[in-house]
């Protein structure tokens, strides 16, 4: 005989609950109680309810990010796809070859796993901020990379991400979150690619099919399980424009930039009193950063949307 577990309401009698009984009848519920049981939440229906809530929160979070001026926005789930794991291994090879120059912080172990930055992290909201403005420096003037024309983007992106995080806390009081800009040890471009914001080009910058590579990125880690967007796929093809244009041959091979040869590194991060001779010879008018590899990218030669964000508009200097 099989064990039949009776409904407590059916067996309730004068404050007593009968023990479960064995019997030959496999149907232990009356028709009425079977109908009631059919109405009870099943695991599948409960999962569907949770999934609906997850979907609504995911979409609302992206809308909230758009309200802060971010476009594109996307979501990735931790630990990420196999391709992201390959990006993590590529970071180690890059470090092993010394391409980080003296940027020792690039080797921080936390860079390999967002869960080391936020305990219990489940999802990553990735955001992009377009800083393209159709303006050119005066002929003969010194040059600053476009991302430096406006206000310090670290502060701009961080402040906006924190507002989004506080909004998320209002929706989910028990959730944890952390705002990350590129000063945080996170594989930021790899996670942006994972969230569908664009693909990592051969010059190592993120490229969006409609906005090109003129955008800075940020991330909001959260313990909330959110719906992931499809990862972006590379559209660089056989193009080698950025590799060919680099005056110091810093792009040693597709997707591999040697900071020791990069003008941007030497004008921003290098703290030595003297620059290497090959760097001095190639500097030209560049005094802060370098945009050569992006200037020649075909994806930046399209009709790109200009940013009207007041924080990225060129300032006199």
Predicted regions and their residues:
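Iron-sulfur cluster-binding cysteine motifs and their immediate structural context
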Residues: 70, 241-271, 283-311
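Short linker/helix segments within small regulatory modules
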Residues: 274-281
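Intrinsically disordered, low-complexity, charge-rich segments with an acidic bias
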Residues: 6-40
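Short, small-residue-biased leader/transition segments that mark boundaries at the very start
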Residues: 1-5
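A short small-residue
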Residues: 143-145, 268-274
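SIR2/sirtuin NAD+-dependent deacylase catalytic core
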Residues: 238
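Short, intrinsically disordered, charge-balanced linker/junction segments flanking boundaries
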Residues: 314-317
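Auxiliary alpha/beta "docking" domains used to position bulky ligands
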Residues: 46-235, 285
């Amino acid at each position: 005989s099989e064990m039949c577990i009776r409904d407590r309401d059916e067996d309730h009698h004068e404050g007593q609950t009968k023990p479960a009984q064995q019997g030959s009848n496999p149907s232990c519920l009356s028709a009425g109680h079977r109908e009631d049981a059919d109405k009870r939440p099943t695991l599948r229906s409960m999962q569907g309810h949770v999934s609906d809530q997850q979907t609504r929160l995911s979409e609302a979070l992206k809308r909230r990010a758009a309200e802060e001026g971010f476009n594109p926005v996307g979501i990735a789930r931790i630990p990420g796809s196999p391709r992201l794991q390959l990006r993590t291994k590529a970071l180690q090879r890059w470090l092993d070859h010394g391409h980080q120059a003296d940027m020792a912080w690039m080797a921080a172990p936390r860079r390999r796993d967002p869960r080391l930055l936020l305990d219990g992290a489940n999802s990553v909201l990735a955001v992009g901020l377009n800083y393209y403005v159709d303006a050119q420096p005066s002929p003969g003037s010194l040059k600053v990379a476009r991302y430096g024309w406006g206000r310090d983007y670290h502060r701009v992106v961080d402040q906006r991400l924190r507002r989004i995080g506080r909004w998320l806390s209002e929706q989910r009081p028990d959730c944890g979150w952390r705002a990350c800009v590129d000063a945080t040890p996170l594989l930021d471009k790899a996670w942006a690619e994972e969230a569908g914001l664009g693909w990592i080009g051969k010059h190592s910058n993120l490229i969006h099919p409609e906005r090109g590579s003129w955008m800075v990125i940020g991330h909001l880690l959260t313990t909330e399980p959110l719906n992931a967007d499809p990862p972006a796929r590379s559209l660089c093809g056989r193009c080698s424009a950025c590799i060919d244009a680099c005056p110091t041959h810093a792009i040693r091979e597709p997707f591999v930039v040697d900071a020791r040869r990069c003008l941007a590194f030497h004008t921003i991060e290098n703290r030595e009193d003297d620059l290497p001779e090959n760097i001095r010879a190639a500097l030209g008018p560049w005094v802060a950063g370098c945009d050569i590899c992006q200037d020649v990218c075909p994806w930046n030669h399209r009709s790109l949307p200009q940013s009207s964000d007041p924080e990225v508009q060129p300032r006199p200097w």
